[in-house]
Amino acid sequence: YTQDPELYRVLSDTAKDMIAAAEEDGRISSYTRETEFDGWDMWARKYVMLGLLYFVEICHEEELAAKALYTAKREADTILAAVGEGEGKKEITKTARMWAGVASSSVLEPIMCIYHLTGEKKYLDFASYIVRSGGSSVQNIFEDAYRDELPLCRYKVLKAYEIISCFEGLLEYYRATGIEKWRVSAINLGRRIR
């Protein structure tokens, strides 16, 4: 953060606009209710949450920071209500028809950030579900990186930015759980990228 007051004002105004954009149930999406949880909806919601959460880190105003976190939590809660395990919920890797769900699975990072800030177990539980889901409907990218047997060009999903984004979330998951396997998985992937 540069400490530039004009930049802070722009970020603050943007955070306020995002907070105001939330629907009554907390949803912030460019997709209609009929088409949500498809296409790039989850990817866009990820960045709604990350934008708000990154702003919380630099916010000078306690009340605004609390509202930004609350808004990010409510957005996450709309996802938790519709996506996951259980009757009537959509599998995370099925919330997009492209790239086998890796873009959707990358919500792991903001979900973990919310968990780190709140300590609310439901977010860690949802993150555990994402990790168990493997990040993709055609390959468990986390397990494959842990086993370290495949070169990246042999992965079934070759969407580099989204895969890296999933692993950023996996590292946050490791930070919360201490499960060494996931740290090793991320290190293996990083080594393969070099």
Indicate where each model-derived feature is located.
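Glycan-recognition and catalytic cores of secretory/periplasmic carbohydrate-active enzymes
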Residues: Y1-R194
